């Protein structure tokens, strides 16, 4: 039988709170007036929503129109967003519902930002450290509130370079953490999925977000986007194993008594030092970043540092 693990920190946050804090199945969404908002132009489209730039009077806002999904999923996202308040987390301003279509829309603050793909190459070492600190600050906070984001990736971050400000967006896959609860492994985007998801381990915790953050940091440090580039979920694990090694993967699976690995993973090789991916001439500059990555990008979710532990790493000692 598979070994059930529990988060090393913040494991019982929700158990200590009133059930109304986390029970989205019983949550009733209070909505505002849809007439206050006007759609201006489309900004993007996702699997579960369409996003528009809008206006409230003369104020710019973001309108996230949700596609028809289970009501509980909408309630979960709204309840989580209403529970969170942090400078590095996008602010939910209102929720409205179309009286005819019954489609829900979430109203967010508007952040002036550049597309990540455009600024990816331009970010210098100090930028990388500062934005990493802000991501970890947001994760430390939401984890302390008993919430896992479950979809950390560059596309779910907006960066205002002029103000050196980052905010984490899209909390549609976020979930309340309860120890020993089985969760869906069909979360996170492929390139940022933790190994625990790829071996179908359902008892994951906040450390999933830390792995995903590590993938983002690796992209920025090594200028390799994405860092683990799988063509499918099974190939994603192959790409991870080619860097972290087959032996350590096998030990991880055996330790938690997971289903045996497919024999195809046997020939992927052994662990490669992450420092070997450092761009020429940057080795000394990125020593601390690589040291942190070596601690984060590991198979065993129980051994990854927490967001708080990451923030105490030497990488963030000087800003």
From Swiss-Prot:
Q: Which Gene3D superfamilies match?
A: Phosphorylase Kinase, domain 1 (3.30.200.20), Transferase(Phosphotransferase) domain 1 (1.10.510.10)
Q: Which SMART domains match?
A: S_TKc
| A Pfam family reported for this protein in Swiss-Prot or TrEMBL | Pkinase
Reaction(s) catalysed by this chain's protein = L-seryl-[protein] + ATP = O-phospho-L-seryl-[protein] + ADP + H(+); L-threonyl-[protein] + ATP = O-phospho-L-threonyl-[protein] + ADP + H(+)
Which intervals hold domain Protein kinase? 37-316
Write the protein's name: Probable casein kinase II subunit alpha homolog
Instruction: State where ATP binds.
Output: 43-51, 64
Q: Which GO terms describe its biological process?
A: regulation of cell cycle
The family line of this record is:
Belongs to the protein kinase superfamily. Ser/Thr protein kinase family. CK2 subfamily.
Entry annotation: catalytic residues: 151
> Which species expresses this protein natively?
Encephalitozoon cuniculi (strain GB-M1) (Microsporidian parasite)
Q: Which GO terms describe its cellular component?
A: cytosol; nucleus; protein kinase CK2 complex
Give the UniProt keywords, A-Z. Answer: ATP-binding, Kinase, Nucleotide-binding, Serine/threonine-protein kinase, Transferase
């Amino acid at each position: 039988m598979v070994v059930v693990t529990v988060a090393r920190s913040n494991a019982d946050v929700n158990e200590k709170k009133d059930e109304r804090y986390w029970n989205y199945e019983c949550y009733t969404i209070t909505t505002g007036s849809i007439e206050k908002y006007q759609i201006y132009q489309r900004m993007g489209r996702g699997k579960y929503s369409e996003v528009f730039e809008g206006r409230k009077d003369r104020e710019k806002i973001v309108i996230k129109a949700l596609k028809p999904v289970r009501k509980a999923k909408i309630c979960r996202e709204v309840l989580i967003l209403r529970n969170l308040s942090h400078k590095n987390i996008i602010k939910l301003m209102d929720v409205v519902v179309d009286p005819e279509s019954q489609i829900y829309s979430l109203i967010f603050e508007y952040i002036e930002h550049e597309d990540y793909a455009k600024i990816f190459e331009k970010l210098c070492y100090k930028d990388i450290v500062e934005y990493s600190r802000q991501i970890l600050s947001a994760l430390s906070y939401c984890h302390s509130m008993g919430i896992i984001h479950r979809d950390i990736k560059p596309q779910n971050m907006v960066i205002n370079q002029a103000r050196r400000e980052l905010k984490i967006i899209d909390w549609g896959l976020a979930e309340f953490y309860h120890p020993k609860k089985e969760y869906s492994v069909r979360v996170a985007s492929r390139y940022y999925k933790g190994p625990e998801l790829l071996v179908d381990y359902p008892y994951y915790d906040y450390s999933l977000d830390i792995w995903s953050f590590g993938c983002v940091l690796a992209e920025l440090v090594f200028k390799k986007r994405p860092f683990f580039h799988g063509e499918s979920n099974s190939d994603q694990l192959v790409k991870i194993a080619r860097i972290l090694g087959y032996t350590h993967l096998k030990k991880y699976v055996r330790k938690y008594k997971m289903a045996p690995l497919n024999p195809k993973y046997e020939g992927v090789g052994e662990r490669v030092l992450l420092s070997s991916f450092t761009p020429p001439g940057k080795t000394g500059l990125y020593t601390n970043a690589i040291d942190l990555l070596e601690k984060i990008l590991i198979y065993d979710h129980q051994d990854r540092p927490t967001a708080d532990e990451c923030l105490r790493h030497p990488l963030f000692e000087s800003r």
